Amino acid sequence: LYGLSGAVVGAVDLVRGIGRLAGLDVIDVPGATGDLDTDYGAKARAAVAALDDHDLVWVHVEAPDEAAHMGDLRAKVRAIERVDAEVLAPILSAPQRPAAMVLPDHHTPLSTRTHADPPVPFVISEPLPGSGGGGAMTFGEADAAATGLLVASGAELMRLFLEATG
C-alpha cells in the first residue's frame, strides 16, 4: 500500500477485511469489541507495538459510531474523549514518534441515527505543504468546512498525508 508496510488494528470484520485486501497485516487485540466497551488502551498498545515493524498502522474505533446509532450524545462525546486520551495520545507519544491522521469513516448524525454522506473532517498531525499550518483550530464538521479544503477521494487524502508527513 503506497510502498509502505502496514497493519490494521480494529474489531469490525468489514474494517479487518478491507485492511487484509489492502495488504495490511491484521492485528488481533484482546478486548477490542467494535462497541462502546472496547479496550481503547489495548488498541493503542497494539498500534504502538506494530509501529516497530510497520510503516503505517490504521487504528479503527467503532464506539463513536455505535453511540450515534443509539442517539446517545453523552456516549458519543465520551467515546471521542476516550479515543483522544486513550488511543491518540499514547500513539503520538510513542518512541517511534509517528505522524497521525484522524478522521471518521463517515457521518452518523445523532438526529438520524444512520450514516450520511457529507465529506468528513480530518486532521493531520503535521501541516499540509503550502498551507502555512492554517487549518481549522478545532476538529468538527463546521470547522473543517470553513477551511475550504475539500478532498475528493481517499487516495487524494492519503497523498496529502504522505506529503505532509514525509
Give the predicted meaning of each segment.
Residues 1-166:
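Feature captures the catalytic ectodomains and active-site-proximal regions of enzymes
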